[in-house]
């Protein structure tokens, strides 16, 4: 599981981007537009997230959809991002966060993922923090890691022991 790349290098892992939710807290905005396609400064939240993933050097994105999935799929096709993006539809009912992640993981042969919520506002300093998190994750052979930020925008890293029975 330990990558052959040296610390400080970006690991060419896969990203999972969670785009299936209803965005209920942003109603009525999200009744006709999925939350990942809402714009800030003429850039969608999803595009901002994908651009960060590309900057990290990741080669493939799994993107789950459910609510207004046709709009997200159309957006991805129209933008023609310079990265492989595989759409994974939740199916007939929404799988929630854990189910969506598990569904995407089943589509990949890789065992390490970086998971993104597109409604997180990523600024330029997060690129460095994500690389630090990856380095810490691999050098310490962790089972999972979570990057957090506080009101002062200083980043924190949370890790936990192995999940029991394979549960998160």
Which residues make up each language-model segment?
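Active-site metal-binding loops of divalent metal-dependent hydrolases
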Residues: 22, 119-120
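N-terminal nucleotide-binding beta1-loop-alpha1 segment
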Residues: 9-31, 56
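Conserved N-terminal catalytic core of the sugar/cofactor nucleotidyltransferase
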Residues: 13, 17, 43-117, 128
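Single conserved hydrophobic/aromatic residue that forms the stacking wall/gate
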Residues: 1-11, 158-168
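Conserved core of the sugar-phosphate nucleotidyltransferase
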Residues: 123-164
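Short clusters of hydrophobic/aromatic residues that line enzyme substrate/ligand-binding pockets
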Residues: 26-29, 37, 95, 160
């Amino acid at each position: 599981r330990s990558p052959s790349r040296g610390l400080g290098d970006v690991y060419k892992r896969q990203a999972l981007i969670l785009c299936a939710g209803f965005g209920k807290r942003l109603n009525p905005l999200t009744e006709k537009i999925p939350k990942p396609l809402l714009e800030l400064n003429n850039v969608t939240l999803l595009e901002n997230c994908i651009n960060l993933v590309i900057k990290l050097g990741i080669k493939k994105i799994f993107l789950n959809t459910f609510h207004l999935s046709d709009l997200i799929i159309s957006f991805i096709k129209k933008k023609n991002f310079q990265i492989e993006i595989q759409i994974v539809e939740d199916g007939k009912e929404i799988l929630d966060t854990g189910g969506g992640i598990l569904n995407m993981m089943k589509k990949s042969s890789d065992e390490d993922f970086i998971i993104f919520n597109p409604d997180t506002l990523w600024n330029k300093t997060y690129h460095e923090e994500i690389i630090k998190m990856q380095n810490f994750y691999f050098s310490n052979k962790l089972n999972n890691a979570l990057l957090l930020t506080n009101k002062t925008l200083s980043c924190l890293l949370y890790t936990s022991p192995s999940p029991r029975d394979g549960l998160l």
